[in-house]
Amino acid sequence: GTGAIDCMKLTLADAGIAPEQVDHINAHGTGTHMNDACETAAIHAVFGEHAKQLTVVSTKSMTGHLLGGAGGIEAVFTALALRDQFAPPTIHYEQPDPECDLDYVPNAGRAQAMTYALSNSLGFGGHNACIALRRWEG
């Protein structure tokens, strides 16, 4: 749906970040076809060709769905990814879905230069949130 698209676009606009500046996304990524295909389509809509340059991970693959706590924990994962310049893996990634065609960092994390990252938290009925984070250079 358009909710995830609008949420990411509004976050980028509010933060004054161009889509091309983003390096990494911690996706809502529940590991279900419906959610993952919709979120992938939304990322393509927001980032265009740049979507293929992003690492898009699901830390839920490691923690499970923490319900009300998921967004906070995933924002921490995203801050740590920026600090450590390391994209965490999407573990248990075994059967690629043709509708999900981004770099999901399957099964093994990797070093990556990152300046800006997003963390998505998308919910049923349009309860969507997204936070933009920047690597601290201090």
Locate each region found by the language model.
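Conserved "HGTGT" condensation-loop signature of ketosynthase/thiolase-family condensing enzymes
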Residues: 1-138
